[in-house]
Amino acid sequence: GVDSGYNRIFCIIDMDTKDKEPELSQYQKLKKKYAEPISKPKKGIYCKVEFFETHRCTELFFLYYFRYTSRPYENQEQLLNDLNQCVVYKKANEFFRKGLHSYFERNNGSLDNAVANAERSMAEKQKDGREYTYSELGRLMTLLKEL
């Protein structure tokens, strides 16, 4: 991480594991620790750590490839059911290794739609104060394009 010489670290956080104590306090403490960039000039270290949250889980961003939702999900299984109505999805390592992005696009999904839907979820979250069904991964994708 920081000591390895990276100047930026992006952390993708599933908020369904951070909405209760003690995990919530631990996560808030971690975000506070990295709120400012790590700067140790004598060691040649400068690193900005950024957090990108999705509530309930990253699979929401995958669903956003296909359609928008602001539905509150009680658990991950409900979200996975909605995703599986759009495309066959299995939460397994071998599935992830095959290139999810191209798989979603071959099945009529779109990264541009996912980014737009994620941005919409964040705009609604800020406007309404909603604390569920949102993703900051659209902002991450935009940042990655700029690198």
What function would you assign to each model-found segment?
Residues 2-8, 15-147:
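C-terminal accessory helical subdomains adjacent to catalytic cores in phosphodiester-
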